[in-house]
Amino acid sequence: MDSRIITTHMNWEEDAAELSLRPRYLNEYIGQQHVKENLKIFIEAAKMRKESLDHVLLYGPPGLGKTTLSQIIANELGVNIRTTSGPAIERPGDLAAILTNLQEGDVLFIDEIHRLNRSVEEVLYPAMEDFALDIIIGKGPSARSVRLDLPPFTLVGATTRAGMLSAPLRDRFGVVNRLEFYTVPELTFIVSRAADILQVVIREGGAEEIARRSRGTPRVANRLLKRVRDFAQVKGEGVITTEIAKEALERLQVDACGLDHIDHKLLLAIIDRFDGGPVGLDTIAATIGEESQTVEDVCEPYLMQIGFMQRTPRGRVLTPSAYQHFGREMKS
């Protein structure tokens, strides 16, 4: 995949810096108001009953704050959090080792939970439902099942693909929340807050310009802020103004709608080679040299959100807005 400044995926080099910008409690968390308000009630109720919070599923496009919310849940409950991911848990024994090391009330966060294999999922079912672990001892006819009690815990699962979760796993989550793209005012506030943490002077217009080009995603907004900060230090006396933000983002090839060179390549390929569609996902991916999953998970959600693309039974189709963005006329 091409390197892109607006990617919604986290890389290891950025992780530590990103952590410093993340809110730690619900009252610091910007946006996702309905999710935040409901979680606050559920957490307070669990604390009043002195019980573990019901299991929580968070889903939505990458970069919207699922990992951050899992940490906030643990902080609000005043418990420890253990973090892992679906691909990292390869065998039932891996999950058993994690579960048996949890303390009462702890939060277990599993990112990309849709990528758990079925044998691991089956170990998770009794753990979620009964706080128990079923272990098979021996082999063949003499094999027997032994049940170990686990301390009550809260599983927080995160996924960009809720539809790929098996029904038995999905049904065991008591709290299910979808995270939505952020508005420009919300992102402007997030950018201003991050600038304050980074000790960067930013004007309101500069924060709004970055927010407008951040694809509705806080992770992208924070990444763009850091790069615009570099331009401001060298060319703007350390102050991020509207003009500095515009110049920096244009140099980074992020346009006024938040689209980068890969989005442009994708949209222009559909316009020029397929007359605006319909065209299949795999064909688009092959045409622009990207993986189908990247196109589907990273590019398409935002293009559909801003009304540039539609998914139809016959394939992807561009809208008149996409043509207007490039100054093209749509063929009738």
Curated annotation (Swiss-Prot):
Binding site for DNA: R311, R316
Residue segments, region Large ATPase domain (RuvB-L): 1-182
Keyword Nucleotide-binding attached: yes
Small ATPAse domain (RuvB-S), as annotated region: 183-253
Catalyzed reactions: ATP + H2O = ADP + phosphate + H(+)
Region (Head domain (RuvB-H)): 256-332
GO biological process: DNA recombination; DNA repair
Cellular compartments annotated: Cytoplasm
Assigned EC number: 3.6.4.-
InterPro entries attached to this UniProt entry: AAA+_ATPase, AAA_lid_4, DNA_helicase_Holl-junc_RuvB, P-loop_NTPase, RuvB-like_N, RuvB_C, WH-like_DNA-bd_sf, WH_DNA-bd_sf
Family assignment from sequence similarity: Belongs to the RuvB family.
Domain notes: Has 3 domains, the large (RuvB-L) and small ATPase (RuvB-S) domains and the C-terminal head (RuvB-H) domain. The head domain binds DNA, while the ATPase domains jointly bind ATP, ADP or are empty depending on the state of the subunit in the translocation cycle. During a single DNA translocation step the structure of each domain remains the same, but their relative positions change.
Protein name stated in the entry: Holliday junction branch migration complex subunit RuvB
Originating organism: Brevibacillus brevis (strain 47 / JCM 6285 / NBRC 100599)
